[in-house]
UniProtKB/Swiss-Prot annotation:
Topological category with respect to the lipid bilayer: Multi-pass membrane protein
Subunit relationships: Homodimer; disulfide-linked.
Native source organism of the sequence: Arabidopsis thaliana (Mouse-ear cress)
Catalysis performed (reactions): 2 a ubiquinol + O2 = 2 a ubiquinone + 2 H2O
Residue numbers binding Fe cation 2: E221, E272, E323, H326
Protein name: Ubiquinol oxidase 2, mitochondrial
Cofactor(s) needed by this chain: Fe cation
This protein's GO CC annotations: chloroplast; mitochondrial inner membrane; mitochondrion
Keyword terms, alphabetized: Disulfide bond, Electron transport, Iron, Membrane, Metal-binding, Mitochondrion, Mitochondrion inner membrane, Oxidoreductase, Respiratory chain, Transit peptide, Transmembrane, Transmembrane helix, Transport
Length: 353
């Protein structure tokens, strides 16, 4: 009687191990092939649960397990891993560099072959040749907006007050002053562009190009800073000061723009006027020999399309022209709001950068 029970139990286990497990493993393994090689452990576990172990005993009987299913799962997993490795190596060879992850998303990590006009390789990832430009050196540097109303006077006084600690701290160290100035000047365009972007999608209306114009301004000011970082190496306490000033100015300007965009743009207009003055003094010290007229950084030569023999004086000159353009744009934006109109009602000055 006990032998009959043992034989019946063995038949049930063998049927499960050879029948059901084949079905489970084949279906799950085919699904895992489509998903990921790392999910291939699932069918092996199912095979184990269904009785496809190695050698095992039931009572006094010794049963030889079936390894065909396990081997099939393991071989398919190793084949898939090998296939992915080949794909990775092949992409690395074709792309000119090692690829850490197979490009499942269709994103090519290898850099395109971009060259300068002279045929040399383009070295920058932060901007491309079609994003470079020549600054408008004929722009009027002496323009000044005379404060007319309370908002204008408040903006003018704010900027004059901000200049006092800057003059005390940096004095005539115009390289460090320019570095600090650009960390502040890169904030308003980003804040204004961000708030206009949110307003545009909130009210389902176009911005008249002002989002693009302000974000271009922020990026341009950031490139000024990246250029200055090639010339000036700030000390640790100056870096700490930058973090402090940026945090305070960003939040203050954000609140100001939410409350009164007219005032915010006027403040930026006056800040740019101060920037023009600072860079003019910078140029005077270069002409007087107080600051060495060193060779221009490579990033500046490519970004502003300067001649290969350009110097620091050329770099400061084009940066000053950029600041004059930002001055005009922000005073223009404030004038639009001063007339009770939205910025989108007047076309934004796009295309300078």
């Amino acid at each position: 009687m006990s032998q009959l029970i043992t034989k019946a139990a063995l038949r049930v286990l063998l049927v499960c191990g050879r029948g059901n497990c084949n079905m489970f493993v084949s279906s799950v393994s085919s699904t895992s092939v489509m998903k990921s090689p790392y999910e291939i452990t699932a069918p092996m576990r199912i095979h184990d649960w269904c009785g496809g172990f190695g050698d095992f005993k039931i009572g006094s009987k010794h049963v030889q397990g079936n390894f065909n299913l396990r081997w099939m799962g393991m071989s398919s997993a190793s084949a898939m891993e090998k296939k992915d490795e080949n794909l990775t190596v092949k992409k690395g060879q074709n792309g000119g560099g090692s690829v850490a992850v197979p490009s499942y998303w269709g994103i090519e990590t290898a850099k395109m072959k971009i060259t300068r006009k002279d045929g040399s390789d383009w070295p920058w990832n932060c901007f491309m040749p079609w994003e470079t430009y020549q600054a408008n050196l004929s722009i009027d540097l002496k323009k000044h907006h005379v404060p007319k109303n309370i908002a204008d006077k408040v903006a003018y006084r704010i900027v004059k007050l901000l200049r006092i600690p800057t003059d005390i701290f940096f004095q005539r160290r115009y390289g460090c002053r320019a570095m600090m100035l650009e960390t502040v000047a890169a904030v308003p365009g980003m804040v204004g562009g961000m708030l206009l972007h949110l307003k545009s999608i909130r009210k389902f209306e176009h911005s008249g190009g002002w989002i693009k114009a302000l974000l271009e301004e922020a990026e341009n000011e950031r490139m000024h800073l990246m250029t200055m970082m090639e010339l000036v190496k700030p000390k640790w306490y100056e870096r700490l000061l930058v973090m402090l000033v940026q945090g305070i100015f960003f939040n203050s300007f954000f609140v100001c723009y939410v409350i009164s965009p007219r005032l915010a743009h006027r403040v930026v207009g006056y800040l740019e006027e101060e920037a023009i003055h600072s860079y003019t003094e910078f140029l005077k010290d270069i002409d007087n020999g107080k600051i060495e007229n060193v060779a221009a950084p490579a990033i500046a030569i490519d970004y502003w399309r300067l001649p290969k023999d350009a110097t620091l004086k050329d770099v400061v000159t084009v940066i000053r022209a950029d600041e004059a353009h930002h001055r005009d744009v922000n005073h223009f934006a404030s004038d639009i709001r001063n007339q009770g109109k939205e910025l989108r009602e007047a076309a934004a000055p796009i295309g300078y950068h």
